[in-house]
Amino acid sequence: MEAIKRMNVEENDFKQLFWQISPKEISDNMFTLVMDNFYVITAGNEAHYNSMIGSGGGFGLLFRKPASWCVIRTDRYTLELIQKEQTYTIAYFSDRYKEQLLFLGSQSGRDSRKMEEVELTGIQTPSGNMSFKEARLIFECKLTQITTPDLDDFCTQEARDYIADAYQKASDYRKYVFG
């Protein structure tokens, strides 16, 4: 049964696998979705794209519109592609793809052929963004803002301690990406 399902995924196009819904129709508990799952951030175009795993972020309203935010290290190749394309996707998967998601997080797409080696099937959305056929939920995001948090921006000592510990080297610095 698994092989048949996988074969069908590979043979179908985006419109056969996914349908557009409004953010209000998402039935997942958003805290569970973000806290208990890795997700994949993908940017680029059909000719060249890159993905990385994310493990923090959230969803809500920004400028009266549905928005997402994720945290990306400044040295990530995916961040370069987000800045270039001004769009990206966030995709969630069932647990059976965890090994492949960890593979996407294990090496840089700048220095490897991981997008060719990963056992997930790339798919272009109708908007021209890239994601994967095996995803169970895809968010298409238009870049709104990229910002760097400053230690003085945080009000609690717990947050300040976290940021001070997380940013010990320049390569550790992270950008907050809103879309």
Show the residue positions of the predicted features.
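Basic, polyanion-binding surface patches
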Residues: 2-179
